[in-house]
Amino acid sequence: MDQTPIADMKFETALAELEDIVASMEGGKLELEASIAAYKRGMELMKHCQNQLADAEAQIRVLENGQFKDVDRSTLEAQ
């Protein structure tokens, strides 16, 4: 299992690793400790992907309002 820092991953890379983790867990061949580690990594990847999707959605909302600028989630949450 890849241990690239999740914060450095692009959405597609994180999603692909998450899909691999799900497949290996569904296969039922992981030992208990490996399953727990895979579950933890998968949850971290899922959160990372959800955050990246939320950021993308926020940028789309800004573009739809005719405001062409970079935004981050903290800016939108303050509004």
Curated annotation (Swiss-Prot):
EC number in record: 3.1.11.6
GO biological process entries: DNA catabolic process
Keywords: Cytoplasm, Exonuclease, Hydrolase, Nuclease
UniProt xrefs under SUPFAM superfamilies: XseB-like
A molecular-function term among this protein's GO annotations: exodeoxyribonuclease VII activity
Root EC class: hydrolase
Main location: cytoplasm
Location of the protein in the cell: Cytoplasm
Any GO CC annotation of this UniProt entry: exodeoxyribonuclease VII complex
Superkingdom in the source lineage: Bacteria
Catalytic activity: Exonucleolytic cleavage in either 5'- to 3'- or 3'- to 5'-direction to yield nucleoside 5'-phosphates
Alphabetical list of HAMAP family matching this protein: Exonuc_7_S (MF_00337)
Protein function: Bidirectionally degrades single-stranded DNA into large acid-insoluble oligonucleotides, which are then degraded further into small acid-soluble oligonucleotides.
Entry's family note: Belongs to the XseB family.
NCBIfam families according to UniProt: PRK00977.1-4, PRK00977.1-5, xseB
Quaternary data: Heterooligomer composed of large and small subunits.
Identification of the protein by name: Exodeoxyribonuclease 7 small subunit
Source organism of the structure: Dechloromonas aromatica (strain RCB)
Upper classification of the organism: Bacteria, Pseudomonadati, Pseudomonadota, Betaproteobacteria, Rhodocyclales
Gene name for this UniProt entry: xseB
